[in-house]
């Protein structure tokens, strides 16, 4: 009941102010591909097993591309798709968990590579939900009037973080980037975010590679968001 009431208040407030709409999109995928049959040569799995559980047939792998390069290529395509010049961008938000450096952030690299001289940029690190949270953040900046045009990018180079002998993770992840250009609009937009840091599924021992409790995550997800 509290969440419903909170939602009603937010909707009423949104009706009074500007909000953002997607005006352009772009993406980038590396050329090198590893399909399920190739994976089955090194781990105990099969194309049928992977597709049945994930729907994934293949994943793109960055051999030379960096996270910032893939993000920039996707961003330039989004700008072209929207018919917008880089100088018009007020903010760049990059959702990533696999940046090459801690500092500078990937968003600053994208600013340089795209020529978005007037934009401020920073990264959002929220794993699988990163792009959604970055998109929601962009809406907040537009809603407040601080920004008029925001570039939101999701970019990952997960292949360098995955243990390719771990069937629980190597079948799921690949590399690539996607970008959306968001501009102010009077159309209504609403989203709701929630976090739960109490679940045991969130915790694992520190490791050199990405680790994930897939079954536990799945069970938590369908409990939190009923199908």
Model-derived regions: residue spans:
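Short glycine-rich or small-residue beta-strand-to-loop segments that form or flank ligand, phosphate
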Residues: 91-97
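Condensing-enzyme catalytic core mediating Claisen C-C bond formation in acyl metabolism
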Residues: 13-64, 166-223
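Short, Lys/Arg-enriched N-terminal segments with co-localized hydrophobic residues
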Residues: 2-17
